[in-house]
Each structure stands twice: as structure tokens, then as C-alpha cells.
């Protein structure tokens, strides 16, 4: 829903899966005065035209700063579009000013409230994986790795948005439980629990491969990542060596129910630099781009990729 231009960043940089495959993201392409004067009929006409040209199961109107500033009524846009096309329309009232995971949180809720309506018979062997995006897990093979881990337990992983599509969302009520792998998906898991009674747990099934074999005994360790991944790494370290002292930090969404008292939120680079300078850490787990920020750190730095931080994936 941007006035024109911002979509290039999304398609060209923010979604690494589109480096190798087609996407179906369109800019509203409106002139300044169209946006300011609220000529919504032109946006509706463009959406209907795009829907006629591609094979789509639904359309989503996603907000950016300009429509946020002029007070765009997304629900009205949704109703106008649904009258002109047979496609279901989602409206996600993002404003382009929050961090990426806030938009993810709204998108998950919009998807499940719109499409997960029918109650199916529960299959205990199926496990829903919520929060699986390249921005959060930083590995395009992560879904396959999680599937392999759960297969060892006789379970089938349903990775919403990373291999499993709209049909899986529609049948979300049939999974025996959900596993939340990013904080952005927590509200979606709560919605599914409230609506269908589906229990959820928080963690990352493939966390073991993120923790190298090091001497963790008595070590003070800092883990910087999105909150659930950081917590999963902490639990994996403590499982191997419970004498370690592990603190987590994140640049992004931080849910109180997932945090320990010593965990911190980071806003500026100086926050991270000061934390490392004064923390006395022996080992740091963080994206490699953050190693240069602390040149005086004398301990072990473990490269733990976070695509949302560096724009780089696990190799």
C-alpha cells in the first residue's frame, strides 16, 4: 500500500526466498495527491487488475508510512476490494515505523483469523511450527532441519509459511500442538489455543546445531538474537553445562513472559557495546557483523546469523 518505491526494498532485500523465485508483491503506485486525497478507488482498481493477472488464493493490503500518516481506513479498503473480486482480502495495518516482528505478529493473526475457521479432528502426530521465517531463523534450510528433528520423534512438522501454505493454515486446528520459534508468533499461538484449544510450547527444535562444542563450565555467556532463538540457545547451553551463566539480549520484540530478569533489550549500537564492555563475558553468540563493534572483546565470538540484523543467511 505504499505510494510507490518502498516495495523495491521488500522484494530486493527483505525476503531472501525471492532471490530465486517469483513473488507477487505490488506497489500501490499512487501519485502523492492520490494518496493524500484518499482516492481509494484507484488502489482498488489496481488490486483487481493484479488479481486478474496472477493465480492467487487471497490478497493482502499491507500498510506503509504514507497511508498511516493520512489515516487510511484499511477495513474500508478491504470491503471495497472484496466487492470487486472473489478473492479473500486481508488488511494488515502496519505503518512502516515499527520493527519487522511487529508486522509479522499482525500478519500471523490476520492469516489465522481469516482462514483457520473450521475445527478438524486433531492428529497428535502433527506439530505446527509458528514463526518460521528467514528473518527469524536465518536459514533457508531451517524448515527441513526442524522436520528431520521432529521426524525422529515420530512427528510431522507443519511449518507455516516456510514450505506449508494456505491449506495448512486453514487446517491449523488439526495439529496436536504448536511450537513457537519466534516471539512474533506468540500471539498467533495464543489465538489458536483460545479458538481451538491447541496447546503450544516455545522453543526451537534444531537449537542443538547452533551451539558448538566448547568448554562452557563456569563461563559467562551472552546470546544476542530474536528472543525465542536466544532462549533456545541458552537452554541448549545449560543442558550441556548447568554451571554456565547465560544472559540474552535482543534488538527486537521482547515478551515479558519469555524473559529472565537478567535479559535486556537493545536499542542502539552503544547499548550492545556497553553491555559487552561491562559484562565480563567469556563467550558471545551473535551475528558476525556485531563482532567488529567490540574490537576489544578478548573472549570467543560464535557467529550466530540473524538475517534481520545483517541481511546474511547461514552458510
Predicted regions and their residues:
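An N-terminal assembly and electron-transfer interface module characteristic of large anaerobic redox
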Residues: 1-315
